[in-house]
Amino acid sequence: MKNFYLLVFIVLQSILFNSCSSSNAVVSHGSDLSKYKYVVFGKESTGDRELDDMIMLIENEIAKRFQVVSTQKCLELLSFGELILAPSINVKSEKGEGGHTYITIKFHDYGTSQSIAVIKSSGIGLTVSHDQKIALNAIRKKLDKILK
């Protein structure tokens, strides 16, 4: 029985140490993300086409925080002096033993093309889907933090 508890302890410990995330955000000096109300999505996404579902999940997270507009509507909003964010999303997932999932979102001002913020996260778990969930949760937390 003692060996059983030792085995359970070792398995739980290995799971805890094998699942981790990291994230980082850098906001351009003088930029105030609270001034932005709108976001436009386009063809700015890169990465493995097999990860389009992850890109859609990230777009959904961004859309929860801004009003999504079309590129045609952007021109009208810009003429009224509105600020619009345009994100570039990159997702990469290493397959195999000890793989990682990396997410990078670069926000730029649609009107000026100036870089506003870069958010990065990574996740490592027991499976590829676990890696992705960990990285997505890290991105959610970082978005919440910088888009208050």
Predicted regions and their residues:
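Sec-dependent bacterial lipoprotein signal peptides
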Residues: 1-20
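A structural "domain/chain start" motif
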Residues: 16-66, 148
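Short, flexible, glycine/charge-rich loop motifs used to bind or transfer phosphoryl groups or to couple energy/partner
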Residues: 10, 29-30, 74-76
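Surface-exposed short loop/turn segments
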Residues: 64, 69, 74-126, 130
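Generic recognition of short, well-ordered alpha-helical segments
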Residues: 53, 57, 100-102, 134
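C-terminal/domain-edge helix-coil "capping" segments
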Residues: 21-33, 59, 114-148
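Mid-sequence acidic-hydrophobic segments that form the walls
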Residues: 14, 108, 146
